[in-house]
Amino acid sequence: MPRLVSHPDEVKVISRRFGTGAADIEKYLEQDGYKATRQAIEKGPEWILAEMKASGLRGRGGAGFPTGMKWSFVPKVSAKPKYVLVNGDESEPGTCKDHVLFLEDPHAVIEGTMIAGLAVGAKTGFIYLRGEYRYLLNIMEKAVADAYAKGFLGKNIFGKPGVDFDIITQTGAGAYEVGEESALMESLEGKRGVPRIRPPFPAVVGLYGGPTVINNAETIANAPHILLMGGEAYAKLGTERNGGTRLFGISGHVERPGVYELPMGYSLRKAIYDVAGGIPNGKKLKAVVPGGASCPILTADEIDVGLDFDQMAKAGTMLGSGGIVVLDETVSIVEFALRTIRFYQHESCGWCIPCREGTDWIKKTLTRFHAGGGNKKDIDNIQYLAENMMGRTFCPLGDAAAMPTLGFVKKFRKEFEDYIEGTRVEHPLIQIQPVGEPELAGAH
């Protein structure tokens, strides 16, 4: 988990309360806490939706779908209860932004959940944390309990008759797969966490069969800030089709790893060299994973690109979940590829044959390759397997495993060939430094 740090280029909107003790409800109230919810109650659902659409906010979990539009898909009238589901199952390797949000500003997540509920007519919200974040559950549960004690949750919230909203917290059991929204609903319903066939989509038939809004934790926590500052003002912080700011967790070989809030469209090069301080020990940049492990890798020559959904797509990769992993010249791409596919093979739910068998065969081939027993046909087979996984699974996990694999093979083929010819450079193992829980809470 990177440290909480700061840089002059940051535009602090969602992170403005970080380091201020805002997990305490009194501290949160001193900083405009729950003010946006009061406004939302007074002005109504149509106003909320208009501001969210004007903000240009796009989903911060990776898909990048416009949030205001997503909320507007929920039918106004439903025979079944409506729900809001916050996806806090942050499990993408290299991603850690939501962790900081839950730790530093849990009430923003609660307030955003309430605002989404008011916008779509839901009376119940669920906040789902990944299994490995179980120690954050105490923080969220205390924040929820404090909100109930203040009359901000439950019946007649803020003293408004008929305005009711409840929040339930839940943790997973450590499966990456349940970060996919339909698998998340299955898990929350007590079933095996595997994806559903769609359509129907969650906005119409979701949790327990009712219309459901599902948003990433960072996405939902932006809602109160947007209502307070105005959707248009928020949009102007970013680019034309990518409104606002975003939390980026910059890790790997940089001088100042940490979670930073940068405007959408900010230069990836500047994020690495200015914000995060560049590559330590005089080493050269080799490659960057720009948005979490599922995003195709960029070489050192490809980092003059803006950090937004559209510019990343033009560069042949994705903004993903905001986890920027920087690799210096000492990193073996073959080893990095093996570590990446090991994760996806382990986390595949096994539901779809292309994902289940494809990840396993790629892992086996890369393992043999890394041990020095590969050949040129293996390189072609790895690419062939990855290409035939693309678009052939119920959920995006198959693509998430295939896309980075294709990037490794296509952009660093010579490095793979060096393993065959015995000319490879010996690289030190990538060291993973564990950070204890007490250090996390105090790392300001």
Each model region followed by its residue ranges:
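Gly-rich Lys/Arg/Thr-decorated short loops/hinges at beta-loop-alpha junctions or inter-strand turns
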Residues: 28-35, 86-98, 202-207, 249-254
